[in-house]
UniProtKB/Swiss-Prot annotation:
Organism placement in taxonomy: Bacteria, Bacillati, Actinomycetota, Actinomycetes, Mycobacteriales
Subcellular location: Cell membrane
The entry's keywords: Cell membrane, Membrane, Transmembrane, Transmembrane helix
Superkingdom assignment: Bacteria
Pfam families documented for this protein: DUF2631
UniProt name for this protein: Uncharacterized protein MT2944.1
Family, as annotated: To M.leprae ML1584.
């Protein structure tokens, strides 16, 4: 019954299994292996922080633009102002941290 199966036998006498060693990438820690992500050769895997800052400012502006609406109560206004302040705080912290070298 088991004669049709072929097993790789290791030098120690047991069946060979997958290695538990981690393969380390030879490049720097910020590079992506082009075998895993082919578009990395064109630079598409890098995060463009300037684009995210512009998107954050657009979100900030959109949240403030929603203050002008057809709602009666001011609870919505406070939520919009709070979320806009949080977005602005995150953007300012990211910009300040990158200029000081705290964030890469």
């Amino acid at each position: 019954m088991f004669g049709q199966w072929e097993f790789d036998v290791s030098p120690t006498g047991g069946i060979a299994v997958a290695s538990t060693e981690v393969e380390h990438f030879a490049g720097s820690q910020h590079e992506v292996d082009t075998a895993e992500v082919p578009s990395a050769a064109w630079g598409w895997s890098r995060i463009d922080h300037r684009t995210w800052h512009i998107v954050g400012l657009c979100i900030f502006g959109f949240l403030l633009a929603m203050l002008r609406g057809n709602h009666v109560g001011h609870v919505e206004d406070w939520f919009l102002i709070t979320f806009a302040a949080v977005v602005l705080f995150v953007l300012a912290r990211d910009l300040w941290g990158r200029r000081r070298g705290w964030i890469r």
